[in-house]
Amino acid sequence: MLRLGRSAASEVSSIRNSLQLQLEQRGARPMQCAYQTQSHSNPEGAKRGRSPMSLAVMGAAALSVGLELQTDGIAQARAAMEPGTQLQRHKWQLFDQIGAGAFGVVRLGMHEESGEVAAVKIVPLENPNDQRSYPALEREIAALKLVKALGGHNSIVDLRDVYVEGRKLFLVTELARGGELFEQIVAYGSFPELKARDVAREMASALSFMHRHGLVHKDVKPENILMSARVVDHNSGVYRKSNRHESSSLVKLADFGSAGPASVNTNLEDIGTAAYLPPEVLNSGMCTSACDMWALGCVLYIMLSGSHPFDLDGMSADSVVEHRVKSEPVTFDFSAWDNVSPHAKDLISKLLVKDPTLRLTADQMLQHPWMNASAEAAAAGLRRPSPLLAGQPIPRGPA
């Protein structure tokens, strides 16, 4: 149905020394991320028409809720679109590429003064083949700025900076060193209940924060949940953080390109991934906070079993999955669920209710008995092998 994509993200063993040593060994020099637009005339600079990305940057600025640091960044980005403007230099150095997608690439960045390592998404300002990516970037910038202005959340990826250099936009966010939740499941199999609960609790808390402020993520899936730390013990689900810049949270909700207020008659091209859309979106285009809870139910099902609830072998066509989502109940009738607690199954069933008005909210999910069960009761059983190891891939969304 949906094919596997990029490999696991590169592990960064230290903040400064290892990156600089790596560059020295390659005989390379770090590229300075600086605002250095040139004042001399050139054919491109003479064009006064704004690119779609310019409008996206200004749109994000218009949606700003007054965060001083990021408002200044947007203002500088807007000014950078005008030829002949000198702007303040930004102190981020760029290193290895760690990801790629339709929008462009993601590279490691290091702040010259603090030594913080971050993820830097680099998007070309003018790419006729990717016009649809500009509204998505506008939504992402606006959503991350809103979250930051509201005080942020420990389980939502934090916006560090946004600026334009030359004809590229740079979106700097905190780095999650453990890679995607999806990659963890593929590599190590399903999670023990204790660790799955930790992830579910943090995601429910993040969604509760967003929903209270009228923001719907609209694309919750394992690929968009990032692990803050790398795995140390695959069987017990132990993780390790080793850096003062790293968050105390286990996971981070990322990729806000679909985020926005609740909507009706939603264009399916603007939101989500097919395998994680609830019945109401498929039937009428209605996308509310309940959509995020359905998707989180799918994620929890995958964490505990290694399979998608409506595509158990990972090979079904989109049309078949859509039919199952609309018409068939979730099932736990295969061996991966033999040792999973009844409370866990009950929670998933209440998240995957077809009627969105009956579906658990994020706050209700946090009060469910399974979310508050004792660690001893949940720790029974080790990780089970992923179905991927037996040639049964779980669905993956597009990059």
Swiss-Prot record:
UniProt domain Protein kinase: residue ranges: 92-371
Organism: Phytophthora infestans (Potato late blight agent)
Keyword annotations of the record: ATP-binding, Kinase, Nucleotide-binding, Serine/threonine-protein kinase, Transferase
First-tier enzyme category under EC: transferase
Protein purpose: May regulate an early stage of the zoospore pathway.
Catalytic reactions of this protein: L-seryl-[protein] + ATP = O-phospho-L-seryl-[protein] + ADP + H(+); L-threonyl-[protein] + ATP = O-phospho-L-threonyl-[protein] + ADP + H(+)
Protein name: Serine/threonine-protein kinase PKZ1
Molecular function per GO: ATP binding; protein serine kinase activity; protein serine/threonine kinase activity
